[in-house]
Amino acid sequence: MKKKVVLVQDNKEILDIMDQVLEEEGFDVTASLTTAPIEKIDEIEPDVVVVDDHIKGSKRGSEVIKELKSDPQTETVSAVLTSTSSSLPRQAEDCKADDYIEKPFDIDHMIDVVKKNA
């Protein structure tokens, strides 16, 4: 069975590239520029969520991950934070993310991080 990934990014081009690459790697991907898939996490049941810290909406990606990790229903879903911020490692640790991907990222590194956490 395919591993499920939810991608939430702030940039459509990056979202499309990540979506295409991960689907080619055999993942079942739900990709969005909004947090809509996170709100349906019980239906999607992803193995990993990859969320950009600067997503559109009222919350930052780190806040979304922190909420997922503090909810007993979703705390076991792996979460990866992405950002261009130099403080990304600390942000990821603070929100209890399982991993992080610094932007701009190397495609192979992104694949490795998602595979490791899925």
What do these predicted regions represent?
Residues 41, 50, 64-65, 74:
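Hydrophobic alpha-helical motif in two-component signaling modules
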Residues 11-30:
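Two-component/phosphorelay signaling modules centered on CheY-like receiver
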Residues 63, 85-102:
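Alpha4 helix (beta4-alpha4-beta5 surface) of REC/receiver domains from two-component response regulators
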Residues 105-114:
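C-terminal output helix
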Residues 9, 83:
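Conserved acidic carboxylate
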Residues 47, 72-78:
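His-Asp phosphorelay/catalytic-motif detector in bacterial-type signaling
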Residues 51-68:
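Conserved phosphotransfer microenvironments
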Residues 31-48, 56:
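Acidic, metal-coordinating helix/loop segments flanking the phosphotransfer/catalytic sites
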